[in-house]
C-alpha cells in the first residue's frame, strides 16, 4: 500500500501555482507582538545554528528553496520550478523572479549558488552538512541553479524545505562578519544576547508557503522576542499583558487551555517522534518475543492523556506523522498493540513472572512530561513481571552514556527512550545504519535497505521505507510512543489570531493579527 501523497519530483518540472489577485484585508494600524522565551538563540547564522531556539529565529528571516505542505508534499519556495534528471543525480531549480534580499539586493541563481557553496564549505562548520547529501558540483545557467550529485539522494527535496537548509543573501557574509540578511518575512533590527531580539516585517515579502494564507508581508509590523528564563515570570508577563505569547510549561499549558482568555498551540507538524528502544545485544532482549512483550505492556493512551495532558497523539510508526510515506494505519498492522494479558503470556513462556521478575534498567533523560511517562511505564512493566529501575540523566550526558551501553553484549538489559525529528523519514538512516545513533545500528540487511531508499524516489522509495518500518516493527526493535514531544508548545492571549507552528517546530507569524 503506497500513500497517495508524494513529492512533486521526477522527470516533469514542478511549477508554482500563480497567486492571482485575491484581495486580503490588512489591518489599518501598526501591530506589534511580543513573545517571551525561556532560552535565547545561540546564533543567527542558519548555516551554523544547531539549537531549536536558534533555528526558530533564523526561519523568520531566511527562506528555503522548497516548501512543505502539511501532508508532506513538496512545493515551490525560492525556486518557482524544479526538475530532477532521469538518473536522479542532477537537480535544476529556477529561482523565482523579483525576490529581494532585506538590503534591497536581488536574490538570483548566483546568490543561491553562493549560499549552497558556503553551506558545503568545511570551513563553515555546518552542523547539518551531511544532510545536504552527496553534492558534487554547483553551477548557474541563467535563472537556474544546478546541483549535481555523485549518486541519487531520495531525501534531497525534503531537506531543501527544512529550516536547516535556509538560504542566505551574499551581503550576509560581505566584509567577513555575518549579518542576518535574508529574503524571509521578517527583517533583523537588533539583538541583545540573553535579553531581546527585535524584527520588523519585510515590506517586499511575497509568500508561496502552502502553510501560510497571507500572500504578502506579515500583518505584524514589529516582532520582539524577550528572554524570560523563569516559567513563573513568563506566565506573569502573559497574564499581565506585558507579552502576547509565551513558551509555557506542560502544566501551565493545561491550565491555559481551560481558560477562554488564552490559546494553546501544539506543534502537530513538528516531525518529532518518541520511541522506546532496547539494548538488544544483551540477553534476553536479543529475543524479539521479549521485546514485543515490553511493547505490549506500554499503555500509550495513558502516557498521552496523563503525562502529556492530552496535548499529544499516540504514534504507530517509527517515523513521525505527516512525513513522506508515513502511514499510521499501515504501521498499526505491523507493530504491537497494548495487550498486557498477551504480554504476560510471552513473559511466562520465557520463564518470567511475579515470582521471577526480569530485572532491567529504564534509562531516560529529563524532559517535561517524559518524567511522568516513565513512572507510568515503570508500573506497566511491573504488571507483566518486569522490575524496571529508572535511571535519569541530563540530555547531553544521557546520549554519551547510551553510546557505551548500546555497544555492550552482556550486562544488565535496558529499555531506553529517545526522540528524533526531521522533515523526511531518512532519519531512519541516521538512527539504524551501523554503527547507528549511539551504537543502536542493526545489521547488514537493514543497512542495505537504508542505502537503497536514499537512491529511490516517489512510490519506489515509499515502498522501501515501508519495508524498513515493517522490519523494525515486526521485530520490535522500536516501540513508537507519542508525537510530538519537546519544545512543541506555545500559548497566547485570546487577542492573538492566526499563529501556527510548522515542521521542526518552526514559528509562523505571517498570518498573525491582534485585536
Question: Can you annotate each of these PLM segments?
Answer:
Residues 40-55, 78-79, 105, 127, ...:
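A structural "hinge/loop" feature
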Residues 80-125, 143-146, 284-286:
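Aromatic- and charge-enriched surface segment that lines or borders ligand/interaction sites
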Residues 94, 128-169, 185-192:
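Surface-exposed binding/hinge segments that line
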Residues 160-224, 232-233, 341, 345:
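Gly/Pro-rich hinge or "lid" segments in bacterial periplasmic/extracellular proteins
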Residues 186, 313-349, 367-372:
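Structural transition elements
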Residues 208-256, 387:
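Ligand-site clamp/hinge motif
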Amino acid at each position: 500500500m503506497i500513500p497517495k501523497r508524494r513529492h512533486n519530483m521526477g522527470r516533469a518540472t514542478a511549477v508554482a501555482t500563480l497567486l492571482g489577485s485575491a484581495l486580503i484585508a490588512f489591518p489599518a494600524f501598526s501591530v506589534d507582538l511580543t513573545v517571551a522565551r525561556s532560552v535565547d538563540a545561540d546564533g543567527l547564522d542558519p548555516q551554523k545554528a544547531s539549537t531549536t531556539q536558534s533555528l526558530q529565529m533564523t526561519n523568520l528571516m531566511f527562506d528555503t528553496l522548497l516548501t512543505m505542505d502539511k501532508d508532506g508534499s513538496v512545493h515551490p519556495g525560492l525556486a518557482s520550478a524544479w526538475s530532477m534528471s532521469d538518473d536522479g543525480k542532477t537537480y535544476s531549480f529556477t529561482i523565482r523572479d523579483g525576490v529581494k534580499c532585506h538590503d534591497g539586493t536581488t536574490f538570483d541563481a548566483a546568490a543561491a549558488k553562493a549560499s549552497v557553496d558556503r553551506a558545503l564549505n568545511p570551513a563553515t562548520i555546518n552542523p547539518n552538512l551531511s544532510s545536504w547529501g552527496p553534492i558534487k558540483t554547483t553551477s548557474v545557467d541563467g535563472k537556474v541553479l544546478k546541483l549535481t550529485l555523485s549518486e541519487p539522494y531520495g531525501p534531497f527535496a525534503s531537506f531543501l524545505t527544512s529550516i536547516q537548509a535556509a538560504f542566505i543573501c551574499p551581503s550576509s557574509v560581505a566584509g567577513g562578519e555575518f549579518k542576518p540578511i535574508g529574503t524571509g518575512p521578517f527583517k533583523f533590527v537588533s539583538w541583545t544576547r540573553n535579553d531581546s531580539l527585535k524584527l520588523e516585517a519585510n515590506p517586499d515579502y511575497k509568500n508561496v508557503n502552502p502553510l501560510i494564507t497571507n500572500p504578502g508581508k506579515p500583518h505584524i509590523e514589529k516582532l520582539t522576542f524577550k528572554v524570560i528564563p523563569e516559567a513563573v515570570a513568563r506566565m506573569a508577563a502573559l497574564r499581565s499583558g506585558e507579552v502576547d505569547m509565551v513558551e509555557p510549561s506542560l502544566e501551565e499549558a493545561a491550565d491555559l487551555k481551560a481558560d477562554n482568555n488564552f490559546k494553546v498551540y501544539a506543534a502537530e507538524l513538528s516531525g518529532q517522534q518518541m520511541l522506546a528502544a532496547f539494548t538488544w545485544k544483551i540477553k534476553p532482549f536479543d529475543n524479539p518475543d521479549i521485546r514485543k512483550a515490553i511493547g505490549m505492556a506500554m499503555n500509550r493512551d495513558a502516557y498521552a492523556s496523563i503525562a502529556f495532558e492530552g496535548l499529544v497523539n499516540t504514534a504507530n510508526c517509527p517515523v513521525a506523522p505527516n512525513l513522506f510515506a508515513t502511514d499510521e494505519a499501515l504501521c498499526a498492522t505491523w507493530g504491537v498493540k497494548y495487550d498486557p494479558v498477551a504480554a504476560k503470556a510471552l513473559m511466562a513462556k520465557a520463564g518470567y513472572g511475579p515470582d521471577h521478575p526480569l530485572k532491567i534498567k529504564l534509562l531516560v533523560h529529563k524532559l517535561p512530561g517524559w518524567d511522568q511517562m516513565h513512572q507510568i511505564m515503570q508500573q506497566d512493566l511491573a504488571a507483566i513481571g518486569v522490575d524496571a529501575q529508572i535511571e535519569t540523566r541530563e540530555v547531553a550526558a544521557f546520549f554519551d552514556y547510551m553510546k557505551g551501553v548500546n555497544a555492550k553484549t552482556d550486562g544488565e538489559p535496558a529499555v531506553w527512550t529517545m526522540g528524533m525529528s526531521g522533515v523526511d523519514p531518512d532519519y531512519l538512516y541516521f538512527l539504524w545504519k551501523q554503527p547507528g545513533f549511539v551504537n543502536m545500528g542493526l545489521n547488514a540487511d537493514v543497512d542495505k535497505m537504508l542505502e537503497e531508499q536514499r537512491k529511490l524516489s516517489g512510490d519506489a522509495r515509499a515502498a522501501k521505507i515501508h519495508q524498513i518500518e515493517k522490519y523494525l516493527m515486526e521485530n520490535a526493535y522500536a516501540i513508537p510512543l507519542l508525537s510530538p514531544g519537546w519544545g512543541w508548545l506555545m500559548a497566547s492571549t485570546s487577542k492573538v489570531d492566526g499563529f501556527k507552528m510548522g515542521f521542526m517546530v518552526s514559528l509562523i507569524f505571517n498570518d498573525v493579527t491582534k485585536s
